Amino acid sequence: MKTTAEIRQSFLDFFHSKGHQVVESSSLVPENDPTLLFTNAGMNQFKDVFLGMDKRPYSRATTAQRCVRAGGKHNDLENVGYTARHHTFFEMLGNFSFGDYFKQDAINFAWEYLTSPQWLGLPKEKLWVTVYETDDEAYNIWNKDVGVPAERIIRIGDNKGSPYASDNFWAMGDTGPCGPCTEIFYDHGDHIWGGPPGSPEEDGDRYIEIWNVVFMQFNRLADGTMEKLPRPSVDTGMGLERISAVLQHVNSNYEIDIFKTLIAKTAEIVGATDLTNKSLRVIADHIRSCAYLIADGVIPSNEGRGYVLRRIIRRAVRHGHLLGAKESFFYKLVPTLIEVMAEAGKDVKAKQTNVEKLLRLEEEQFARTLERGLSLLDEALSQVKDGILSGEVAFKLYDTYGFPLDLTADVCRERNITIDEQAFDREMEAQRTRAQAASQFGVDYNSVIRVDGETKFEGYTEVESQAKITALFYDGKSVESIEVGQSAVVILENTPFYAESGGQIGDSGYLSTQGVTFNVKDTQKYGQVFGHIGELTQGSLKVGQSVNAIVDAKRRHNTSLNHSATHLLHAALRQILGLHVVQKGSLVSDKALRFDFAQPEAITKEQLSEIETLVNQKIRANFPVQTDIMDIDSAKAKGAMALFGEKYGDKVRVLTMGDFSIELCGGIHAKRTGDIGLFKIITENAVAAGIRRIEAVTGQNAIDWLHNQQRILTQSADLLKSDVNTLVEKIQQLQDKTKKVEKELQGLKEKAAMQAGSDFVKSAVKINGVSVIAQQLDGIETKSLRVMVDDLKNQLGSGVIAFASILDEKVNLVVGVTNDLTAKIKAGELVNLMAQQVGGKGGGRPDMAMAGGSQPENVAQAIKVAQDWLNKNL
């Protein structure tokens, strides 16, 4: 019996023997395709080839493409674990022809691979096929050339309500390449319910689609007209998990070797014994998508791809919780995943440490709110009477406890309860509206500025040039002219001003001509034109007028130093921390630079010092900052780093600094690294799970920062009557002295409190014959309060003591109950009741319990509540 890894390799070997180029699986993050959330089909990486926008050195290709369907149009998340064939992650085996072979060869290749004893050797009588209703060519190839009996060839027409809307007609979109397809089905046998495709019972599990062969032969125009393509192509896809299930003689994908191993390992880690539990299926599926997404550069976050990843991780963690997992478990599956994926696991293995760390951190973060969120959900579900959970509750779980909607839906599904999603959407929209109102943005010119043509950028070599005004925008509208005092956006035919991009701020400066001055405060790009944003301070401007465009050269220069320093920092981080470090965002201004990057753990002070030292070494090396224009493939072959999420054209600008840094970048840079002068890190911290941020200054700004630090040190030393060299020692002495005095003071407070014990006994009130002391004592630590309570219990013999103390703006609560009363009065119950009044919680033994709180203004109320409760319960 073939393993899944062997099947994957045999597919690639077969098509390689037929003259196909074996192409590596592309990233799960689609390159240069903003229309896709994740790679979800084998043809994604060849989309531009099919559209005629890209050419490859081969006309036949084959791949084993990793895919994710867990967001957007193709969203299988809610069904994963509950059906035999739904997954968030799967592998699509495919062969492709770019204007080479067509229907005859495509069908013959598929049949040979499936049925030949040399390859898969499936019984021919087990295979059924479908064709598009009018595709006589494909029908005849199957029937007359291949020899499939007519009764096992099914014509499928337009079964989705409109022309060419059919299971057997594929289209890339509303317009563009499209064509009929033929699908191959495997018959599992009459012991399983279900009918052949096109029958009323087609949704059963007896007949399973294993291969789809698409014939791209038309170009659909906007009016619906179908034009024949001059060079028809072929796009095929076969699910690796599905064909593995067929060859391994199982009916569910979750029973194939890969999943059996992952399920067994999950059960071992969490201590589960029932290997058929659906939660084990969910976790085994989710570790594949999560590990590969992280390996491909996705970081858990609250938006976009990162939020889909977070949703999948949290769903897996919740199912681990259902299985009884007591500690972080999800990341422990990564080594097993790498092992079972064989050759296809190499990308995860290369980044294994980072993948495991991010999964562990995300699980630990969610574990803090999971229990509280589930308690709230359980309580809400227990009160549901009409089978519908309110959208308000679902939104609170999302907003407060980090529960994605589909996780809440998962819990509800287990109890046959649905969610009022319309109410959830209303709450979400209301939150967006509040956020927009709070932001108080002015005019959004992104939706207003529409100008034909483009602005020619001259700023790489110039800071001043003559330019013609092609458009003016004022108060959100296109205008012909502007007057003094008006804030506007000026569009120029050409400009030396750099428009904000790649993290670098837009240039400032001014536009001028005879008697006219327009102060440019910022420059932004709107489509292909540059908008110069600012205020007219003298004269008037009109469309068609020529102006001098003059950039603030000093600000530009300082910005360029920071941008070049950012590249050096990126390279230094990767050298010292590891190649898992990739840029996640940046802000480059004239004042400072800010750099966000993937890093799962905190950076030590020693590492930070090493990073700073390395950057300064490369500055002193005085490398030339070299610029080259080349095609994207040549740039990558040269080792240039492409930034995650950036879209690049055919030609790219490559920035090289010696043998240390090479990146794709369109920004403004120093001429040599030595121009930067000095690099100084001023802050480093975490900004999100798995993402760190460094802020730094360079050049004169770095010198000014160091001068200010020196001034602070000198002033501090003067205050302590020390010098800078012995300042640390002086502060340590002062701290030691302060601690000693504080300890002596606390001792005096405790002594005074103990001496007051007899006064407390005298002031005890009787409630139904039981002595009760409920008092506020300020400035006393919890430890001292416990000593006092124990002493008073001995003095009273029988009674209840409840003390509240305010210390450093925090509330300390201690409750003691003598042993003869614990059957009726529990110290933990009473202290929790008091803690609720001061914004805290606590617990302990029936005879002694403690709590803390953050609302000292409510201490009197806590004492009163304790007295009232004791009056009621004694």
From Swiss-Prot:
The keyword Transcription regulation does not apply. It catalyses: tRNA(Ala) + L-alanine + ATP = L-alanyl-tRNA(Ala) + AMP + diphosphate. Pfam families: DHHA1 (PF02272), tRNA-synt_2c (PF01411), tRNA_SAD (PF07973). Its EC number is 6.1.1.7. It is found in: Cytoplasm. Keywords: Aminoacyl-tRNA synthetase, ATP-binding, Cytoplasm, Ligase, Metal-binding, Nucleotide-binding, Protein biosynthesis, RNA-binding, tRNA-binding, Zinc. One of its GO terms (cellular component) is cytosol. Binds 1 zinc ion per subunit. One of its GO terms (molecular function) is zinc ion binding. InterPro entries: aa-tRNA-synth_II/BPL/LPL, Ala-tRNA-lgiase_IIc, Ala-tRNA-ligase_IIc_anticod-bd, Ala-tRNA-synth_IIc_core, Ala-tRNA-synth_IIc_N, Ala-tRNA_ligase, Ala_tRNA_ligase_euk/bac, DHHA1_dom. GO terms for biological process: alanyl-tRNA aminoacylation; negative regulation of DNA-templated transcription. Zn(2+) binds at H563, H567, C665, H669. Its cofactor is Zn(2+). Belongs to the class-II aminoacyl-tRNA synthetase family. NCBIfam families: alaS. HAMAP family: Ala_tRNA_synth_B. Catalyzes the attachment of alanine to tRNA(Ala) in a two-step reaction: alanine is first activated by ATP to form Ala-AMP and then transferred to the acceptor end of tRNA(Ala). Also edits incorrectly charged Ser-tRNA(Ala) and Gly-tRNA(Ala) via its editing domain. Consists of three domains; the N-terminal catalytic domain, the editing domain and the C-terminal C-Ala domain. The editing domain removes incorrectly charged amino acids, while the C-Ala domain, along with tRNA(Ala), serves as a bridge to cooperatively bring together the editing and aminoacylation centers thus stimulating deacylation of misacylated tRNAs. This is Alanine--tRNA ligase. It comes from Haemophilus influenzae (strain 86-028NP).
